[in-house]
Amino acid sequence: MYIGICICVLLAALSASSTGQQTVGSMNEDPGAREIEQQNILQHPRHIRASSSAQLKPFQRIDGTSDQKAVIGAMLAKYLQTRKAGSSTGRYAVLPNRPVIDPTHRINDRDYMGWMDFGRRSAEEYEYSS
């Protein structure tokens, strides 16, 4: 956290000093140098792009019929309903092909199906192995 603040302060100081040098340098220039710079600009013109708004045309979909929009909307609604119904079981939903653990099992506080606490399992083996 402290390092991040130091880096931000350092970057702010560097950017402020660099912008300060640019403005001071341009104020201390003599008028002859400014004229030479303007002549160089006139001799070597830059190529300027046309404005992007003039090139753009409105986008129209050819295949976007109302039937397709209705089908996509229905599919999206169905997906969201199944997603909401599935989220009530928690982050890890139980898959139908996994075996169901008997509720009378000695270790019944598992978070998910693949859970294994080695300390508790070894204690179980020693405790109930008589």
Curated annotation (Swiss-Prot):
The keyword Signal applies. The modification Sulfotyrosine is found at residues 112, 126, 128. This peptide hormone induces gall bladder contraction and the release of pancreatic enzymes in the gut. Its function in the brain is not clear. Keywords: Amidation, Cleavage on pair of basic residues, Hormone, Secreted, Signal, Sulfation. Residues 1-20 form the signal peptide. One of its GO terms (cellular component) is extracellular space. The modification Phenylalanine amide is found at residue 118. Belongs to the gastrin/cholecystokinin family. Expressed in brain, lung, testis and throughout the length of the small intestine. In the brain, expressed predominantly in the optic tectum and brain stem. It comes from Aquarana catesbeiana (American bullfrog). Residues 21-60, 122-130 form a propeptide. GO terms for molecular function: neuropeptide hormone activity. Its main location: secreted. It holds the Pfam family Gastrin. Frog brain contains CCK-octapeptide (CCK8) and CCK7; whereas the gut contains intact CCK33 and CCK58. The precursor is cleaved by proteases to produce a number of active cholecystokinins. This is Cholecystokinin. It is found in: Secreted.
